[in-house]
């Protein structure tokens, strides 16, 4: 697994697929402005303020979050597609 640095977070997007009558699986055809994801890893160091204090990420592993669409770097690790995002691109934590 990846170990993110600074204000970065590793997530897996929970993309829903649509299935047609013929059984073909298609990715969603219309783009949402946000995407739901599960947090897989967060930075252990956070970012430093101008005074040198460390600000740790406010999300934790396992949480579901909403992320602005298009603000991710997709990578493949151990045959799994994951994305690296900045914590500031997370707009909400999903609660149940």
Curated annotation (Swiss-Prot):
Protein name (database record): Co-chaperonin GroES
SMART domains: Cpn10
Family: Belongs to the GroES chaperonin family.
SUPFAM superfamilies per UniProt: GroES-like
One Gene Ontology term from the biological process aspect of the record: chaperone cofactor-dependent protein refolding
Function comment: Together with the chaperonin GroEL, plays an essential role in assisting protein folding. The GroEL-GroES system forms a nano-cage that allows encapsulation of the non-native substrate proteins and provides a physical environment optimized to promote and accelerate protein folding. GroES binds to the apical surface of the GroEL ring, thereby capping the opening of the GroEL channel.
Any one of the GO CC terms: cytoplasm
UniProt keyword Cytoplasm, yes or no: yes
Subcellular location: Cytoplasm
UniProt keywords, alphabetically: Chaperone, Cytoplasm, Stress response
Oligomeric form and interacting partners: Heptamer of 7 subunits arranged in a ring. Interacts with the chaperonin GroEL.
Source superkingdom: Bacteria
A GO molecular-function annotation: metal ion binding
Gene responsible for this protein: groES
Species whose genome carries this gene: Streptococcus pyogenes serotype M49 (strain NZ131)
Location (main, coarse): cytoplasm
InterPro entries associated with the record: Chaperonin_GroES, Chaperonin_GroES_sf, Chaprnonin_Cpn10_CS, GroES-like_sf
């Amino acid at each position: 697994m990846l170990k993110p640095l600074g204000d970065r977070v590793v997530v897996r997007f929970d993309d829903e697929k649509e299935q047609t009558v013929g059984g073909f699986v298609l990715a969603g055809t219309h783009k949402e402005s946000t995407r739901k994801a599960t947090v897989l890893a967060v930075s252990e160091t956070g970012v430093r303020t101008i005074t040198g204090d460390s600000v740790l990420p406010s999300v934790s592993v396992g949480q579901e979050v909403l992320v602005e669409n298009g603000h991710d770097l997709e990578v493949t690790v151990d045959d799994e597609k994951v994305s690296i995002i900045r914590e500031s691109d997370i707009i909400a934590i999903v609660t149940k």
